[in-house]
Structures are given as structure tokens and as C-alpha cells.
Amino acid sequence: MPADSMEKPTASPIAGAPANSAQTPDKPKSASEHRKSSKPIMEKRRRARINESLGQLKTLILDALKKDSSRHSKLEKADILEMTVKHLRNLQRVQMTAALTADPSVLGKYRAGFNECMNEVTRFLSTCEGVNTEVRTRLLGHLSSCLGQIVAMNYQQPPSSQQPVHVQLPSSTPVPMPCKVNPAEAISPKVFQGGFQLVPATDGQFAFLIPNPAYTSSPGPVIPLYANATSPGGPPSQSPVQGLTSFAHKMPHMAQAVSPLGGSTRADSAESVWRPW
């Protein structure tokens, strides 16, 4: 074959390309890099969910309060949340009133729970040294005032399986003494050592009164307690009145909180106590 008829070999563009230009698979991103890259997207979605929920909440709360939405078109997020909280509190009060009317035992549970919380606050303040005396006195005075309002509420007759026991809050130094009383045996007034008096009533109820020299003209608030009623032939029911904490050496004129139920009775009780907070 003639030499001039032979084609000269030409360099291939692919063959002449450098080796590092070959396509390589991308490296997988680490977890931290993935979170960093997806954080703006997640933040955008979160804000969208919040705004959507607030918009729905605004519509619901304005309809519930029967307000014109055109006049409240520029409500801030804080205003919407505050209006919702107030509305839910009002609903809670209405539901509590309806429950008190339908179930007479609800008020007793509420009183017992409030008194239990007040007793815990009193016990803490009597042992805590860092609390100012003025603040302590004001706080316990406010709780005593609230307790008096709760006691003044209308209370229906509890079921026959329970007998209410009324305990008067003392302001002088009380003497912790457990009391075991059988309602069937409470026929006449009995006076115990220390001036404690048991006064029966005609309807089967009885009151356990503690002497209160500082408030002889105006008796203190009375808290109902409950003990399981038993038949005259059965064993006497026990209603220990315990937890009489006293710090009269610091505040002699403050009312003391009385635990509505003893420790063993509280542990064995099948019904839970509703706490107001």
C-alpha cells in the first residue's frame, strides 16, 4: 500500500483527556451536613404550621366570643393566645359549676384537695428559713381567705356511704392528736382532754371543734372530712385527724392548716383528690 494513502492516526479527545476528569459518584453527606442543609426548610415549615394554627384559633375564638372578625382582623399572636386562655378559664368555671350541681361529691373533693395543698404550703413555710415573715403571713392569710370562700359555697348532702366531719381551723398552738370516732356512737356532746369537743347533729353528722381563744367571737372556717360509715354492729370507722402543723412561735395569729385525711387513710383511699393547681 502506498505510504501516502495511509491515514495518520489522530489523537482521540477522550484518550487525551486527563484521568481526573472522569465522572465519580458524589460522596454521601453526613448527618450534621444534612441537618444543616435541611434546617431552613424545617424552620419554614414550622412557621407555616404555627401561622396556620393561629389563624384557625383566631377564627374559633372570635366565633366563640361572638365578635366581629372584620374588626379584629389585625390581632397579634399574643392577643389570640391571651383571648384563648381567658375563654378556656371561663369554660372551666362553667364546667365546674355544672359538675357541682350534678355530682355533690365534687365539691368535697375540691375542698379536700385545696386543704391538702394549703397544708403542704404551710408545712413548707414553717420549715423554710429563707422566706420573709411578712410574705409568709400575707400568703397564708390569702390562702385562709380563699379557704373561707370555698367553705361558704353551697354544699349538698354527701352520699350515705360517707359521713362529713367538720374540723375548725385553730389559730392558737394546736395539739396533734389522732381522733377515732364512730358516727353511730356520737349521741351526746363529748369533751376530750385539752378542750376538744365533739358535737353531734340530728342528721347523723358531727363536728370536731378545736378551741380557738383568739377567735371566740367569730369562728374560723370549717373543713369537711370524710370517714367511711359503718353499721352499729360493725367495727368503728376511723377518721384520724393528723398533720396539725404549728409555727405559732413565728406567727401566733395565723390560722393553721389541718390535713383532711391521715397518711394511712390517704394511701388507702381509692378516690383521687383533685388539686386546684
Swiss-Prot record:
A motif (WRPW motif) lies at residues 274-277. Keywords: Developmental protein, Differentiation, DNA-binding, Myogenesis, Neurogenesis, Notch signaling pathway, Nucleus, Repressor, Transcription, Transcription regulation. Dynamically expressed in the borders of several tissue territories. Expressed in the pre-placodal ectoderm (PPE) from gastrula stage. During gastrulation, expressed in the deep layer of the dorsal lip, the Spemann organizer and three distinct regions in the prospective neuroectoderm: neural plate border, presumptive floor plate/notoplate and anterior neural plate. This is Transcription factor HES-4-B. Residues 34-91 form the bHLH domain. It is found in: Nucleus. Its main location: nucleus. Has a particular type of basic domain (presence of a helix-interrupting proline) that binds to the N-box (CACNAG), rather than the canonical E-box (CANNTG). GO terms for biological process: floor plate development; lens development in camera-type eye; muscle organ development; negative regulation of apoptotic process; negative regulation of DNA-templated transcription; negative regulation of skeletal muscle tissue development; negative regulation of transcription by RNA polymerase II; neural crest formation. Pfam families: Hairy_orange, HLH. CDD domains: bHLH-O_HES1_4. The keyword rRNA-binding does not apply.
